[in-house]
Amino acid sequence: MKIQIIWLTLVLIVVEANAVKQGKNATIPALIVFGDSIMDTGNNNNLPTLLKCNFPPYGKDYPGGFATGRFSDGRVPSDLIAEKIGLAKTLPAYMNPYLKPEDLLKGVTFASGGTGYDPLTAKIMSVISVWDQLIYFKEYISKIKRHFGEEKAKDILEHSFFLVVSSSNDLAHTYLAQAHRYDRTSYANFLADSAVHFVRELHKLGAQKIGVFSAVPVGCVPLQRTVFGDKELDGVILYINVYDTLFDMIQHPKKYGFEVADRGCCGKGLLTISYLCNSLNQFTCSNSSAYIFWDSYHPSKRAYQVIVDNLLDKYLSKVY
């Protein structure tokens, strides 16, 4: 527990020190998101990576039933948060080649499924690193200035909500590949330093209102239960504060109206993710709302909604 608490505290100190609270009637002009598959709305679609989900049954509960590249049966937290703060029902992926300049005004997500703070994570998965996401963010601000002027760019930087959601893939996958260099404590410290550095770099670029989600209880998702069983994967992996809600949902599913917590809806739900979750798999459930997880790693649309409803107002009230 001590490692996670230190990590979370380090990140939140940076965020809150740089946040200037606005008046009660303040509006949020845009939502800008960085991170991994939890927030990816399609940035991986045109990448040379196996971590894609722009095919059925992904998106079966999305408006129109379309598979858009979201790692869930429906909308993901970036969409739900954008709607909750009054911007739009969906948040566009920055890498969408069909985006028009006006589509940028209410925000975008740079998140890329499979990435993390550790540069090796993105390299292994052939996805967009969080550090490259910062480069794309600079490009985004340049586009805003070019099409809508300096004042609009200033408004977005000063008053938008910036959200960073990463580290789950570092903990679930890359840590084991880095075991020759790090033990659990030193790897946690490396990720903590990386998280703080990322937030500081984002603030240097002008962001003022930054929220940071810590890692999900990775050892409790179906894939990790299946692969690692009862091996010792506690410590940094299990109990990070921001996802207390998800951990409680996994431990007490009926409390939140769920029936299944130990496997995903897609396929048999234990080792079913990306291309293994496909329309040929005859075992996909008919009622994803009964499941906390959609596939073996990602929560269902309904689970995401519970998390957003439980956390967003509490944390937004600190800076707005």
UniProtKB/Swiss-Prot annotation:
Q: What are the TM regions of this chain, as residue ranges?
A: none
What InterPro entries does the database record attribute to this sequence?
Answer: GDSL, GDSL_lipolytic_enzyme, Lipase_GDSL_AS, SGNH_hydro_sf, SGNH_plant_lipase-like
Record's subcellular location: Secreted
Example of a GO cellular component annotation carried by this entry: extracellular region
Give the intrachain disulfide bonds: none
Work out whether the entry's keyword set contains Secreted.
yes
**Record: active site:** S37, D295, H298
Report the EC code(s) recorded for this entry: 3.1.1.-
Q: Where is carbohydrate linked to this protein?
A: N25, N287
* CDD domains named among the record's database cross-references: SGNH_plant_lipase_like
Q: What is its main location?
A: secreted
Keyword Signal in the entry? The reply is yes
Broad class of enzyme this protein falls into:
hydrolase
GO biological process terms, alphabetically, are: lipid catabolic process
Recorded GO molecular functions are:
lipase activity
Keyword annotations of the record: Glycoprotein, Hydrolase, Lipid degradation, Lipid metabolism, Secreted, Signal
Family stated for the protein in its record? Belongs to the 'GDSL' lipolytic enzyme family.
Q: What is this protein called?
A: GDSL esterase/lipase At3g43570
